[in-house]
Amino acid sequence: MAVKKMVEAVFVVGLVVTMMNVWGAVPVEGAISCNQVVSAMTPCATYLIGNAATPAATCCPSIRGLDSQVKATPDRQAVCNCLKTQAKSYGVKLGKAANLPGLCKVTDLNVPISPNVDCSKVH
């Protein structure tokens, strides 16, 4: 009987720990989703991964729209994590990516686009 209670207790503790890990992986409420970031960056693809010398006419307005949604550190970190993943996946030209915030005159969205950035340090 005592063994059964011990097994039940271990099971409950394990379940609680698992649920805490899952809930901890949920984005912070209000943080920008990666889908929003990718959607905003899509008009910039010919510049960031292609051979275009300048961003497309629709790139900067799209980036400024995303910039206006960035309100706090969790937003910038969410954008950073998404861009970090996308930079790895799509072979973003990092020099061009570094120039994009200045070219588009964005302020809050000024986060590095690099596969090597530590997004926890973005504030």
UniProtKB/Swiss-Prot annotation:
SUPFAM superfamilies in UniProt: Bifunctional inhibitor/lipid-transfer protein/seed storage 2S albumin
Disulfides per UniProt: C34-C82, C44-C59, C60-C104, C80-C119
Molecular function in Gene Ontology: lipid binding
Signal peptide positions on this chain: 1-25
An annotated GO BP: lipid transport
Matches recorded under InterPro entries: Bifun_inhib/LTP/seed_sf, Bifunc_inhib/LTP/seed_store, Plant_nsLTP
Record's keyword terms, sorted: Disulfide bond, Lipid-binding, Signal, Transport
Superkingdom per UniProt: Eukaryota
Protein family (similarity comment): Belongs to the plant LTP family.
The protein's role, per its UniProt record: Plant non-specific lipid-transfer proteins transfer phospholipids as well as galactolipids across membranes. May play a role in wax or cutin deposition in the cell walls of expanding epidermal cells and certain secretory tissues.
Protein name per the record: Non-specific lipid-transfer protein
Organism: Pinus taeda
Lineage of the organism: Eukaryota, Viridiplantae, Streptophyta, Embryophyta, Tracheophyta
